[in-house]
Amino acid sequence: MKKMKLVLVGNGMAGVRAVEELIKLAPDLYDITVFGSEPHPNYNRILLSPVLAGEQTVEQIILNSWEWYAENHITLHAGKTVTEVDRVRRIVRAAAKDGSVIEAEYDRLLLCTGSNPFILPVPGKDLQGVIAYRDIADTNTMIETAKTHKHAVVIGGGLLGLEAANGLMLRGMSVTVVHVNAWLMERQLDDVAGGLLRKSLEDRGLKFLLNAQTQELVDDGNGRVKAVRFKDGTETPADLVVMAVGIRPNTALAESMRLHCHRGIVVTDSLQTVTDARIYAVGECAAHRGIAYGLVAPLFEQGKVAANHLAHLGIGRYQGSLTSTKLKVTGIDLFSAGDFMGGEGTEEIVMSDPFGGVYKKLVIKNDKLVGACLFGDTADGNWYFRLLQEGCNVRDIRGQLMFGEPHGA
């Protein structure tokens, strides 16, 4: 039987995981072609921070070696950017660095174009020394810059920004984190935990400017950044500026294909685009029920469902994901999930030990745990997340909740 043709646009974690799942379910159904704009096989983007910090090498974060593609009879076009998709003839066209064009036909198309970093629209954003932090090339630029320059400014006090700041500090740079909000990681932490995080990072040598609005990146006269100027007129020196102020789904290709996009490529519960059932979208580029996810767990869940449908099983349904954040920033453990800010109709149980560097906050509503924010001691994070996911009634264990999972539970 002649095989169908599957083309994957985007050689990242979400798309390749979907292909792995598909190969498990239907190893001989498709001839698979993969296009990736980076000149690398699939790697673990989450581990770019340890690479920046000098704790791991690029080779150590590769998830799928060149050999894996060959062993699974996958045609990989690495370093080739897809520029056009003809939906009528079902042809994908990609451009190589030398200008040559590669074409591939498809019966099914999987779009995993990911996201683009948001760049603040301020004067000086195009100066040399101003970068985002998304891939191996960005990481290598930071490592090289740290060898010859002293002052770094990271704009953005979220997870990515703090990891970039920590890595640059370990590379010997003097690092200032600039954040527009009143506390760090406001999407994952409340003000108390955010304050504890700031103090811990200051103790390690990072500097912070909070409630700071960037007005301009200042030119040194030779086309390179030399300082960041703020709305209040003050400046801080910068040989390197790293923008870590969020991401936007990369929908440019999908829009050129006239696929419906709103906060991402709009998909159904089967991860098929609402415009064209032959085309699937998975990962940061996809908008499911109005949400584009930027964390790995939901992307892998999506990949599993898409693979199920591509394998003609057709029983998987993606229902959305409850997400949690569990992370380590310079040895500091953090965990948050659900509605950890609380509010009307909720009850909060709080344990705070600022001297020991431990803070726990649990939010309860209608006898159910609806949110958790942990700092310094995250041992029970997985248990709390399970209670959240399953919507368990916690009335009978309310008194013990703060002390962790009961034995025999």
Where are these regions (language model features)?
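Mid-to-C-terminal Rossmann-like scaffold of FAD/NAD(P)H-dependent oxidoreductases
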Residues: K2-K5, K24, C285-N382
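Beta1-alpha1 glycine-rich phosphate/pyrophosphate-binding loop at the start
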Residues: K2-T75, G167-Q188
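Glycine-rich Rossmann-fold phosphate-binding loop(s) that bind the pyrophosphate
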Residues: G10-A14, R134-D135, I155-G158
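FAD-site-proximal beta/loop scaffold in flavoenzymes
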Residues: D126-H149, D219-R229, T234-N308
